[in-house]
Amino acid sequence: MAAVDSFQLLYREIARSCSGYVETLALVGACYMASKTVIFMRDCYSLIRLYFVPRLVRHRDLSQQYGQWAIICGASEAIAKAYAEELARHGICVILISKDLSSVSDTARLISNNYGVEAICIEADFNQGPSACKPIKDAISSKDIGFLVNSFDGTLEISQNFLELSESVLWGTINRNIAATTLVTRLALPAMMEKGRGAVVNISSGHCFHPIPRKAAFSASTAFLDNFSRSLHYEYGDQGVFVQSLLPFRVASQRPEGSAPPASWLVPSPQVYASHALSTLGISHRTTGYWPHSMQLGLVKMMPEWVWMLGSRVFTMAT
């Protein structure tokens, strides 16, 4: 009995001496939970404000807000085509730039017939260097350019070790994903600055937040587009030019069956994605453009890099 009494007495003494520490830990835990709750509520508010509220209000007059013409660079890409159609739906005329006219001529004809706006095609292969800029400069000189949409070239997304890539593929990655965006932005931005209005939208990839093995050059080029957009925002955002970085995850495309995922809630069609993305223009400077993708991005940011690397290695090896 004495041993039991001694243990109980010892326990009470220890508990009494540690009570201050326990209260401190409880306070720290409460503060942590409160901060997480505030962050969660803020994220929910941002999600609703960005993706749901704009789709409930009436359509904006984009031509009056930004300008009458849009340049779509990389117009052969599925998202870029859909974005051009969405702009045309709002009465915006489009200039489709691609290295192969045959890949965008049908899109231009469809836009003109369905929406009654002008659609011009320009062939510009940036693998040829600065000479690719001349036809673009001539075409936009007399136009009220209000939008510039630069889309990354998805055909360069090759799953190979870096040293296995040919020089032509590497130059293509640099010229068509980096040089094209930089040079066309340089052509379009002065007119926007002069008018004090305009929008530059750079479409890259949500995968730019972490490195991707076997896609080193491609993933680095998407990170460039994101960083370039954010830098331009801080340089010219206070002068009437809205610069947005779009960071989508997987989007269904018109590629042959089996080479692209079918459209679903998590993998939207280009048309669904473009409709959601355009509604975020003028609201967010950096977004996935589609609310399920924003939820994906939240998970990606919380994921330790070693977990991401393990998953990306398995995925890229499978593709």
From Swiss-Prot:
It comes from the Eukaryota. Keywords: Mitochondrion, NADP. GO terms for cellular component: mitochondrion. The keyword NADP applies. It is found in: Mitochondrion. It holds the Pfam family adh_short. Gene3D superfamilies: NAD(P)-binding Rossmann-like Domain (3.40.50.720). NADP(+) binds at G74, A75, S76, E77, A78, I79, A80, K99, D125. SUPFAM superfamilies: NAD(P)-binding Rossmann-fold domains (SSF51735). InterPro entries: 17-beta-HSD3-like, NAD(P)-bd_dom_sf, SDR_fam. CDD domains: 17beta-HSD1_like_SDR_c (cd05356). Residues 2-82 are annotated as: Required for mitochondria translocation. Its main location: mitochondrion. Belongs to the short-chain dehydrogenases/reductases (SDR) family. 17-beta-HSD 3 subfamily. This is Inactive hydroxysteroid dehydrogenase-like protein 1.
